[in-house]
C-alpha cells in the first residue's frame, strides 16, 4: 500500500446516511488522499483520529454536484460527490479552485478502475429523492451520462489579469511513472473493423496515446501505426502483472478450473487463478495418476512469507521474489507437488472477450453487413436468428416486431447499454435503426437459454456446477448493481449459456420497453409474478434489491434443474402466498448453505436483502468450500 500523500485539506462532509434512521449532519474533517485510500480524520491524520476511509479502487464516480443556487447549510459552498460501493459521499470545498483540484486528482487515481459508472446523478439526494430526476430509490440508476474523461461541468474561472503575464509552472509530478509512457501487452488478437482501429497481435507491445473512452483506447504499434483498440484486450507491462502470462486465469473459480483442466486431459496441466481470499492466488493442477490409478485435481495456495522483502512459495523450502519465478521453478521441479507444472491451460487465445461494440463509437450497424442464418427462437419482441457480421463474426439478431417495443426510447438507451461490458453479460454490439423492422445485434451464445439447458440435461449436473452457474449470474448482476443498472426481469429464461458452459445475463433493462399490457401490468397474465418481490407486484417499485429477490428464484430454478416456481399455483395465488410469508421449498440438490442464500434474497423488506456484492462474496466462499458439496 502506498501512503504517499497526494492531497490533504480540511473539508466538510455530509453524513452518508447508510441507514434510513441515520441523522443528516455536516462535519469538518481532515481529508487525505493517497494512491490507495481517501481517508478522513477528526483533527489530526493519526489512526486513532480516523473517522472513515474509502478504498480508491471501489470508487465508481467523482464529479461536481450541480446545486442550482440551492441552500448549502455549511460554510463551504462548493460540493462534489464520491460514489463508492452502494453509497455517495458529498464533500464541500472552501473554494472552486479547491474543489476542482480534488475532483481532478481523484479522477486521475480512479481512471483505471473497472467499475466506473455509465450514468450518475448530478444533483443531491435530499429528503428521500434525487433532486435531478426525483427518483426515490437511493440505488436508482443514474439519469445523466457520466464521462470520467470530460472536464468538470463548471467552466474554469478566467485567470486574474496579473497572472496572464506569464504561464503558470507545470504541476509537480506525483510519481515518476505518471510521466512515463504507458506500454501495454496484447492478451488477444484483434482485427481492425474500421479504418480508425488498430490491429492487435497477441504478445506484442503497444504504446497508449489516449484514454478518452473506458472501453476503447488510442494506441500505436511498433511500426508507427495508430488507432483504437479494445481496452480489455491489453494489460499493463509490469513485472507484477500476471495478466500477461498464459497460465493466469483471472475470473476462474474452482469448478470452472477443474472443468477446463479435465477437458484438456494432460498430465501436469495447470493454471494460476485468483483465490477466494482477496489478494491471494491458487495453482490448480491436474494429474492422471492422482492415487489408486485415478486422475485428480490439486489446488495449492501460493503462500507469502512474513519477511521483508516478501517472498512467495508453494513448497516452503523454495521461496521466490515473484509468482512467475515460482511457476518457472515448478515447471522443472515437482518439489512437493503431485507432479511438476508441465502444461499451461488457459482460455486466452481461444475465447477472446467481447468488445463494447465492434469498433470505437460504432453502435449503428449497416444491415447489409449482416447475414441471416437459422432461427434460434422467438421472444417478447420478435424472432431471434443466428447470423454473421461481415461474414466473419457470429451474432444473434433480434428482429423487433412492430408494436412490440417503445423503439425511440430503446434506441437512445442502446448507446448506454452498449457500454455495459462484462464477461458475464451478453454483449450488445449495436442496432440497425434505419429500416423496419429494427434489429438488435448481440453476442451469440452457442448453448442457448439457461432454462432449456437445465431441463434438457436433468440428472447430469453436479452440485458444484450448478453453484458455478449461480456464481456466473451473480457476477454479471454485481456489475449491473455497481453501475446502478436494474435488470427488472432476471430469470433463467433470460440467461444464456456459451459453448464453454459460461452463463451470461441477457435482456437487462429490456422490460422497460415492452408495450404489451399483459406483460407490463402486474395483473396481466404474462407478468412474471413468480420472480417478483412484494414491492414490485404491489407498487411496481423496481430496484437492485428487487433484482436480488429474482436472483434467489433463479437460484431455485438452477438447483431444481429448470422447474417452474410455484408450478401448481396461479399468479393471484402466488401473490397471496408470498404476502403471507410463504417461500419456495428447499431443492434436493441445494445444501442448507445454498438454501440459506436463497432465503436471504427473499426477505420481505428490500433493505433486509443482501446486495449482489454481498451475495457474490458468499457464493465465492461456497464455491471454494469442499464441505459444501459433501466431497
From Swiss-Prot:
Its cofactor is Zn(2+). Residues 179-239 form the SH3 domain. ATP binds at residues 376-384, 398. Keywords: Adaptive immunity, ATP-binding, Cell membrane, Cytoplasm, Cytoskeleton, Immunity, Kinase, Lipid-binding, Membrane, Metal-binding, Nucleotide-binding, Phosphoprotein, SH2 domain, SH3 domain, Transferase, Tyrosine-protein kinase, Zinc, Zinc-finger. Pfam families: BTK (PF00779), PH (PF00169), PK_Tyr_Ser-Thr (PF07714), SH2 (PF00017), SH3_1 (PF00018). It catalyses: L-tyrosyl-[protein] + ATP = O-phospho-L-tyrosyl-[protein] + ADP + H(+). Residues 247-345 form the SH2 domain. SUPFAM superfamilies: PH domain-like (SSF50729), Protein kinase-like (PK-like) (SSF56112), SH2 domain (SSF55550), SH3-domain (SSF50044). Residues 157-178 are annotated as: Disordered. Binds 1 zinc ion per subunit. Following B-cell or T-cell receptors engagement, translocates to the plasma membrane where it gets phosphorylated at Tyr-519. Undergoes also tyrosine phosphorylation during platelet activation. It comes from the Eukaryota. Residues 4-111 form the PH domain. It is found in: Cytoplasm; Cell membrane; Cytoplasm, Cytoskeleton. Residues 370-623 form the Protein kinase domain. GO terms for biological process: adaptive immune response; B cell receptor signaling pathway; integrin-mediated signaling pathway; intracellular signal transduction; protein phosphorylation; regulation of platelet activation; T cell receptor signaling pathway; tissue regeneration. Expressed in a wide range of cells, including hematopoietic cell lines like myeloid, B-, and T-cell lineages. The active site is at 489 (proton acceptor). The PH domain mediates the binding to inositol polyphosphate and phosphoinositides, leading to its targeting to the plasma membrane. It is extended in the BTK kinase family by a region designated the TH (Tec homology) domain, which consists of about 80 residues preceding the SH3 domain. PANTHER family: TYROSINE-PROTEIN KINASE (PTHR24418). Belongs to the protein kinase superfamily. Tyr protein kinase family. TEC subfamily. This is Tyrosine-protein kinase Tec. It comes from Homo sapiens.
Amino acid at each position: 500500500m502506498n501512503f504517499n500523500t497526494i492531497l490533504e485539506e480540511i473539508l466538510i462532509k455530509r453524513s452518508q446516511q447508510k441507514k434510513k434512521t441515520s441523522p443528516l449532519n455536516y462535519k469538518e474533517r481532515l481529508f487525505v488522499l493517497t494512491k490507495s485510500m481517501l481517508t478522513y480524520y477528526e483533527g489530526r491524520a493519526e489512526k486513532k483520529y480516523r473517522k472513515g476511509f474509502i478504498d480508491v479502487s471501489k470508487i465508481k464516480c467523482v464529479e461536481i454536484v450541480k446545486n442550482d443556487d440551492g441552500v448549502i447549510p455549511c460554510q463551504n459552498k462548493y460540493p462534489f460527490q464520491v460514489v463508492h460501493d452502494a453509497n455517495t459521499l458529498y464533500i464541500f470545498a472552501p473554494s472552486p479552485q479547491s474543489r476542482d483540484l480534488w475532483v481532478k486528482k481523484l479522477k486521475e487515481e480512479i481512471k483505471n478502475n473497472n467499475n466506473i459508472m455509465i450514468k450518475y446523478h448530478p444533483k443531491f439526494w435530499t429528503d428521500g429523492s434525487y433532486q435531478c430526476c426525483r427518483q426515490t430509490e437511493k440505488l436508482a440508476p443514474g439519469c445523466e451520462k457520466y464521462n470520467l474523461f470530460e472536464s468538470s461541468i463548471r467552466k474554469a474561472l478566467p485567470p486574474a489579469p496579473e497572472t496572464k503575464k506569464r504561464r503558470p509552472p507545470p504541476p509537480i509530478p506525483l510519481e515518476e511513472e505518471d510521466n512515463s509512457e504507458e506500454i501495454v501487452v496484447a492478451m488477444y488478437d484483434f482485427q481492425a473493423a474500421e479504418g480508425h482501429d488498430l490491429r492487435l497481435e497477441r504478445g506484442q507491445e503497444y504504446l497508449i496515446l489516449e484514454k478518452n473512452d473506458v472501453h476503447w483506447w488510442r494506441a500505436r504499434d511498433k511500426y508507427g501505426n495508430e488507432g483504437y483498440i479494445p481496452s480489455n484486450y491489453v494489460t499493463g507491462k509490469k513485472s507484477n502483472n500476471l495478466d500477461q502470462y498464459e497460465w493466469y486465469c483471472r475470473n476462474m473459480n474452482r469448478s470452472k478450473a477443474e472443468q477446463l483442466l479435465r477437458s484438456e486431459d494432460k498430465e501436469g496441466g495447470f493454471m494460476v487463478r485468483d483465490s477466494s481470499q482477496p489478494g491471494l492466488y491458487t495453482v490448480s493442477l491436474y494429474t492422471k495418476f492422482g492415487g489408486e490409478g485415478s486422475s485428480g485435481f490439486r489446488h495449492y495456495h501460493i503462500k507469502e512469507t512474513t519477511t521483508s522483502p516478501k517472498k512467495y512459495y508453494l513448497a516452503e523450502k523454495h521461496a521466490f521474489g515473484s509468482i512467475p519465478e515460482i511457476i518457472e521453478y515448478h515447471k522443472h521441479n515437482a518439489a512437493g507437488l503431485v507432479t511438476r507444472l508441465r502444461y499451461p491451460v488457459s482460455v486466452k487465445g481461444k475465447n477472446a472477450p467481447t468488445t463494447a461494440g465492434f469498433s470505437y463509437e460504432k453502435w449503428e450497424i449497416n444491415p447489409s453487413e449482416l447475414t441471416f442464418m437459422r432461427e434460434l427462437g422467438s421472444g417478447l419482441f420478435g424472432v431471434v436468428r443466428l447470423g454473421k457480421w461481415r461474414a466473419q463474426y457470429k451474432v444473434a439478431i433480434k428482429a423487433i416486431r412492430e408494436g412490440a417495443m417503445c423503439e425511440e426510447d430503446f434506441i437512445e438507451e442502446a448507446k448506454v447499454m452498449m457500454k455495459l461490458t462484462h464477461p458475464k453479460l451478453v454483449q450488445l454490439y449495436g442496432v440497425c435503426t434505419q429500416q423496419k423492422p429494427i434489429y438488435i445485434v448481440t453476442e451469440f451464445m452457442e448453448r442457448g437459454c439457461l432454462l432449456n439447458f437445465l431441463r434438457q440435461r436433468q440428472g447430469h449436473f453436479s452440485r458444484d456446477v450448478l453453484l458455478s452457474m449461480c456464481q456466473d449470474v451473480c457476477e454479471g448482476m454485481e456489475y449491473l448493481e455497481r453501475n446502478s443498472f436494474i435488470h427488472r426481469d432476471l430469470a433463467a429464461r433470460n440467461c444464456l449459456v456459451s459453448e464453454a458452459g459460461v452463463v451470461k445475463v441477457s435482456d437487462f433493462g429490456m422490460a422497460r420497453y415492452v408495450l404489451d399490457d399483459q406483460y407490463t401490468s402486474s395483473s396481466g397474465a404474462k407478468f412474471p409474478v413468480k420472480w417478483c418481490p412484494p414491492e414490485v407486484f404491489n407498487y411496481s417499485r423496481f430496484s437492485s434489491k428487487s433484482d436480488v429477490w429474482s436472483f434467489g428464484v433463479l437460484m431455485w430454478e438452477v438447483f431444481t434443474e429448470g422447474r417452474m416456481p410455484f408450478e401448481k399455483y396461479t399468479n393471484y395465488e402466488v401473490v397471496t402466498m408470498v404476502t403471507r410469508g410463504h417461500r419456495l421449498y428447499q431443492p434436493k440438490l441445494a445444501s442448507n448453505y445454498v438454501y440459506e442464500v436463497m432465503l436471504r434474497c427473499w426477505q420481505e423488506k428490500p433493505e433486509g436483502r443482501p446486495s449482489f456484492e454481498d451475495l457474490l462474496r458468499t457464493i465465492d466462499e461456497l464455491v471454494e468450500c469442499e464441505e459444501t458439496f459433501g466431497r
